Design a protein with these regions (language model features):
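Catalytic loop of short-chain dehydrogenase/reductase
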Residues: 2-3, 8-46, 55-66
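Residue-level detector of anion-binding/catalytic polar loops
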Residues: 50
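C-terminal helical subdomain
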Residues: 53, 66-168
Length: 169
């Protein structure tokens, strides 16, 4: 990429890099990926190599099963949109930043295969607003006063069942 004076490095991370979620390893790994994109963007800017992190919403994968969660195909469409549809101006502004897949869907017009009327995208977009507002706060990941979350306190019944390692023993 440096030799070609052009490139795009994309990382897929998680909101778990901003708040405590699951465990220490999960949060630290995702915070490191977010920071790595920022640092690479800083160092590689003069070589026209951009680094961007994308944050999918809750997912539907072989490991998690959030109701109406984003499919791997949806996340793949976000990657393709950045590679094929985003212009240089957009990529320059996104360089070093963390972007939500739902914001990319809204901008570039992709959706889940089953979302025939766009209502799933709209619900996800509305649902992402509190997370984006929290990200605007100064270092929200360093709020140690709130204590650790209790998965039993969530308003989503069965939340702990979504993660095999989440239930207390």
């Amino acid at each position: 990429m440096i030799q070609n004076n052009s490139g795009l490095i994309l990382q897929i991370s998680s909101y778990g890099g901003f708040i405590y979620f699951c465990d220490v390893g999960y949060g630290v790994a995702h915070a490191a990926m977010d920071r790595l994109s920022y640092d690479m963007a800083t160092e590689l800017k003069d070589q026209n190599v951009r680094a961007i992190t994308i944050h999918p919403g809750a997912g539907q994968t072989e490991i998690t099963a959030f109701p109406d969660g984003e499919s791997p195909n949806f996340v793949g469409r976000a990657v393709l949109a950045l590679m094929e549809k985003a212009d240089d101006n957009f990529l320059d502004q996104a360089n070093g930043k963390t972007l939500f897949t739902i914001d990319l869907a809204k901008k570039f017009g992709f959706k889940e295969d089953y979302d025939t009327d766009g209502s799933v995208n709209e619900a996800r977009y509305q649902g992402s607003k509190p997370f984006k507002e929290m990200m605007l706060n100064t270092l929200p990941q360093y709020d140690t006063e709130s204590g650790l979350p209790k998965y039993s306190d969530t308003n989503n019944e069965g939340f702990a069942d979504l993660f095999k390692g989440a239930k207390p023993k």
